[in-house]
Amino acid sequence: MAENPYRLTEDDILEPPTTFSGKLRFLGPGFILSASIVGSGELFATTLLGAKAGFVCLWVIIFSCLVKVALQLEFGKHAIYTGRTTMQALNDLPGPRLGRGHLSIWIWLLIMSFKFLQVGGIVGGVALIFMQIPALADFGLIWWTLFTSLVVAVIVSVGRYGFLEKLSLIMIGLFTIFTLVSVIALQWTDNAFSGAEILSGLSFQLPTAAVIIAVGAFGITGVGGDEIMAYNYWLLEKGYAAHTGPRPGWTSGEAHDIWLRRARGWIRVMTLDAMAAMVCYTLVTVLFYILGAAILHRNGLVPAKTEMISQLGTIYTESLGPWAFGIFLGGALVVLFSTLLSALAAWARLFSDAFSQLGWGNFQDPESRKKSVGTCAFVFPAIWAILFLQFQAPGLMVIIGGVASAFILLIVVYAAVIMHRKWAPRELEGGQFYKTAFLLSSVAIVAVAVISSAKALGWIS
């Protein structure tokens, strides 16, 4: 791995693997992304949508997971052929500026203030899991909230990319097994589902009462705006851009052709990484939706405040026995903690880089970056803990964050269009299928943001 992956030099150039097995050895950024994606959105937003709408909105979840990948690929391509971070790219966008920063960075900072509620809800979700265990409940909610915040802060402050990648892979395996077992176990309960019910969820219907929850679920399931923005940092730290090397100053000749070949090769590796992540989080997200539709919707339950985890766990206990409750709690803990860990690692980098673009620090300098990331690793969990203890409504907090994520996607769309239309080398633009998928992603995201805005303003009920 490059000594400083955020700076491209000739010394770190590496030819991309050409075989499938060779490419598999270089996968990794998608692991961290999947660990971040599969968590609060699934345990809270996805199950809430299933509880309110039943199986009929299953297609919304699948669409949400599939449609945003083209934007993720565009951001990833940009990182590989330029070596620039997300915030460096935003700061170079055309449009108005405020001080040293592009307006998009300031808007992102404003929207992210609402996202603090979302991750505060995740911290609370982890604390509530500990509170479900009689032997641990005596410590109290405040203690477990602070404990959760401290543990994740310590891990992120000392963990580097390789450690985060391995830990994410372990958690992905655990929560995938957990969700599969949970859904399969349903078939031995009164809440068993049928193939006809699954097919009814692919009928492209959307009840009016479920519109705002569907919008929130769209923002928070699948790859979200903040996760697309964070993906570049994991690609850079894995070394994809460093292995591609700096782009020659001229656009023709042997050196440029060699660079193009390397860039295409590492973009193919990145595409495989993104597709593998998509398969993983789509599968787990669909399974969580089925849990919400089959258990909560059938029983007329729409969990509020701190009841989500306990209601799901109680129904499993009634159907399968006391042993099921412990397994459910363990799985829920892994799911939520994976999101918490990955989100903090990403936020620490995104905010440090954003502050650097505004003139506060130097993200490109390894020592300055390490200090800034370490500081954010402790400050952010403290804020999340305070917010949860103030509101104590993890489900609502996560949904609010999901709506905020839908607006962050607008920034992502604008930046991705500029990358695709103006910045990408002509030879790396992609084929017609990719261009069509990119257009569909952009239109869908803008449409959801418009619906969300109209709902918030009371223009639609």
Which role fits each region the language model picked out?
Residues 33, 61-94, 107-118, 342:
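Juxtamembrane transmembrane-helix boundary signature
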Residues 173-233, 413-425, 448-460:
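Hydrophobic alpha-helical segments and their helix-loop junctions in multi-pass secondary transporters
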Residues 70-81, 236, 242-243, 279-310:
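Extracellular/periplasmic helix-exit of transmembrane alpha-helices
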Residues 101-136, 336-354, 394, 446:
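Hydrophobic transmembrane alpha-helices that form the core helical bundles
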Residues 1-43, 216, 243-245, 262-271, ...:
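Membrane-interface "cap" regions at the ends of multi-pass membrane proteins
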Residues 6-11, 46-48, 73-99, 130-134, ...:
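Flexible loop linkers connecting adjacent transmembrane helices
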Residues 170, 349, 353, 359, ...:
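C-terminal membrane-solvent junction of multi-pass transporters and transport-like membrane proteins
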Residues 138-147, 323, 327, 355-390, ...:
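Loop-to-transmembrane helix boundary motifs in multi-pass membrane proteins
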